[in-house]
Amino acid sequence: MKKIALSTLSLALLGAAGAAHAQSSVTLYGVIDTSLTYVHHTDGNKNLWALGNASGGDLSGTRWGLKGQEDLGGGLAAIFQLENGFDPSNGRLGQGNREFGRQAFVGLTSQTYGTLTLGRQYDPVVDLVQGITADNYFGSAFATPGDVDNYDNSSRTDNAIKYLSPTYAGFQFEAMYALGGVAGSTGSGQTWSLA
């Protein structure tokens, strides 16, 4: 009888531990987008085989990353994302030779109050507007020349403080302010964005 009670208690505790563990997560993800290119008679009578697209025209940036969430209770969770971009043909880092040059942020999220993040991240135009096209190569017809609005998803913002509202009656907004990072000049290099 004691063995059955102890076994039942052990199973109940194991189940409770599994439920508590399920509330937190860390995900490893990635995309390798490369190509094998053959060009006939590139320079006189030479043929060219190359790994990767020499013009940089692969459809999606190669990347790997970690993202996670830790439940803090009361509907609040801590979140983070670290995303590395690299060239799959030679292993070189992208985004100015940064280890996590695509994204590197931490934050808090709540279904009631929204999400606040701090770090290197995309601006609100990329998060809420750019997604209506498949990618920046075919969707660039909607971007402004020179990508001054970052709709073409060509830049990330350092030192950014970003807030994403919860959805109210089908409406959601996102606002961002990025510190300039110029010592002695608080307004120099700052970024504002709203979508």
List where the protein language model places each region:
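Detector for outer-membrane/organellar transmembrane beta-barrel domains
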Residues: 189-195
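Gram-negative bacterial Sec-dependent N-terminal signal peptides
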Residues: 1-23
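Outer membrane beta-barrel
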Residues: 24-38, 49-180, 188
